Amino acid sequence: MLERIGLVIEVHPADVDENVLAGEAPEAYVARIAHAKAIAVARRSDLWVLAADTTVTLDGTILGKPDTPEEAAKMLRWLSGRTHQVLTAFVLLGERDDSPVIHERLVSTDVTMIELDGAMLADYVASGEWRGKAGAYAIQGIGAALVREVHGSVTNVIGLPIAEVVAALREVRGPLPRLAAGTPA
């Protein structure tokens, strides 16, 4: 997503344990995982590191990525007609003026689903779009038809709150080069 606004990035996977700890609140969970990812990558790189983790939560329960069509249908039935939160924690690590910099932020977006009838639910699950998606839907795809309202960052729901990340980059690194689609920064 950052490449679309002209930033040049390198992706370095972080091998961290993403299991939820007993009694861990969703906000604490995404913050812990984003921080662990940032530290894991920073140990292998001298570049600025941006790490993030996103989850879907309803009534304080974390909704992960369903493994089966049945799990996807169960999640979607639970979300049907209700407002849930998409939480993303991101961490920026780097150096500025020979001093270490760490910036952590949590972004929350409220998403309200329409009431899903049986046919709509069955059709969406049959599409397979839910695979690999926390909360069992993808707002950037046909899952957009399941969403009535979004309050907050739409790009957060897609996977990364771009405006908030760019603001944080400007805060910790200073002015960024010109941002334009297709123009590397």
Regions found by a protein language model. Give the residues of each.
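N-terminal G-site helix/loop of the GST-like fold
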Residues: M1-V11, V172
